[in-house]
C-alpha cells in the first residue's frame, strides 16, 4: 500500500483554506490515528484462547487422577510449589513484601504501603519472579493478585476501610494539633502515593525482567457494577467508577495485559442480569485497553470459574457459559482464564466431577467458541485480526452453526470438530462482526500490511486521506452555502 507523499499531505491540510476546515481535518486525522490495533495473540495466532489456572495437579498427586485439559491452550496451577508454568499468579505472599492487615487487624509487612520499604520489597520481588518464572523467555500470563487494598483512597470501603483508618492514625500520631481535615488530606496523599509506587514499580519490575510476559493485576480494571439486586439493573458501570478507572492511567500504562473477573452468583443463574453484569465488565476493560501509551490495545483476558461463586462445584449452565465466555469472545477479548481453588480438589469425587464437566459441556463450549473465533478471523480478517461485534449489545455470538458442524469427544479425551462453514454461515458472520486488526495490519479485512507507523502504529493510504479531505472540505463548503 502506498503512503501519501509528504507534499500531498501538506497540500490537503495546510493550503490556505478557512481555519475551521483545517482544524476539522486535523481533528479527524487525530481521531483516526487514535484507533489502535490489537496486540498479536499470545498463542499461535489464535484470536481467542482458554487458559487454566486451578490447582488440579493435586488430583494426580492425591488420587492418581489425571485431568484432561487439552481444550486449554495454556495451563498453570496456583499452588505455592509450582513454578515454570505459562500461567503464573502471584498472591500476596509470593511477590516481595506486600503490606496488608489480617481480618483481626494484625499488620503484615507493615500493614500499610507507606510503612514498608519499597526497595526492600522490590529486591525480594525480583527473587520471587526468578523463582516462579525461571525462564527469561517466558511469554505467558503473569497475574498479580493483590486484593487487600486498592490504590485509590475512595475505593477502600467496607473491610478495606482499615487502610484509611490506619493511615489517619499514622498522620495524627506524627503531628500534634492537626485538624481533622488536614489529617484526612495528608493520610489520603501519603497512602495513594505509596500504594501507587508499590503497584507501579512492582509490575514494571516484572515487565523488565520477563519482557515477553503479559503482566497485569487480577481484577483490574473493575467496573464495580455489583448492585445486581437493584430494580431495573442494567449492568452499566457507575459513572464515578469509570472516572476513577480513567485516573489509573499510570497503572494501565505499566501493564501489558488486563485481567478483569466475571464471577456469577448462584441466585442469578440463567438471569439476564448475569449477561448485563458480564457485558459491561468486559466492555469497560476493552475501553481501558485502548487508553495506554502502548502502540496497541492491551489484550484482555477475562477470569471466570467453572461454577458459581458460592458453590464452585455447582457448574455454570449453558446459558451462563454464553453470558460469560461467549460474551467475552464476541466483544473482542483475547481469551478467558478459568480459576479455581482447593475446593475443586478436596476429594477424589470433586476431581472426578471437574474432569467430567471439563470433558463434556464446558469443553465442548470452549471448542465451539475458540473454533468459531478462528473461522471468523480466517474468513473476515485473513487471520490477521479478531472478530468483534458490530453492535456491542446485539445477541450475536461466535458460535459454530450446529447445522454445519458437529462436535464430538474422542476416546482419548480430545474434541473433534467435523464440518465446514456454509456460505450462509460466513455471510451471517460478515453481517454481524467486523475485524480488529493485529499490529502490522489494517483495512476492513486486515489484508493490508502497515508500511509505516505513526504514534498509534497505524498508517493511512493516500486515497483514504484524500477522500477524507474532500469530504471534510465539501461538508464545510455546504455549511457556508
From Swiss-Prot:
Segments traversing the membrane: 12-32, 456-476
GO cellular component, one term: cell surface
Extracellular face of the membrane: 33-455
Pfam entry (one): Glyco_hydro_56
Assigned keywords, A-Z: Disulfide bond, EGF-like domain, Glycoprotein, Glycosidase, Hydrolase, Membrane, Transmembrane, Transmembrane helix
Compartments, as annotated in UniProt: Membrane
Disulphides: 59-351, 223-237, 376-387, 381-435, 437-446
GO BP field: carbohydrate metabolic process; chondroitin sulfate proteoglycan catabolic process
Record's bilayer topology term: Multi-pass membrane protein
PROSITE patterns (UniProt xref): EGF_1, EGF_2
Recorded superkingdom: Eukaryota
Active site per UniProt: 147 (proton donor)
UniProt-listed SUPFAM superfamilies: (Trans)glycosidases
Glycosylation sites noted in the Swiss-Prot or TrEMBL record: 64, 115, 232, 343
Known catalytic reactions: Random hydrolysis of (1->4)-linkages between N-acetyl-beta-D-glucosamine and D-glucuronate residues in hyaluronate
Top-level EC class: hydrolase
EC number: 3.2.1.35
GO molecular function: chondroitin hydrolase activity; hyalurononglucosaminidase activity
Cytoplasmic topological domain: 1-11, 477-481
Function noted in UniProt: Endo-hyaluronidase that degrades hyaluronan to smaller oligosaccharide fragments. Also has chondroitin sulfate hydrolase activity, The best substrate being the galactosaminidic linkage in the sequence of a trisulfated tetrasaccharide.
UniProt-listed PANTHER family: HYALURONIDASE, HYALURONIDASE-4
Family: Belongs to the glycosyl hydrolase 56 family.
Protein name (record): Hyaluronidase-4
Organism annotation: Mus musculus (Mouse)
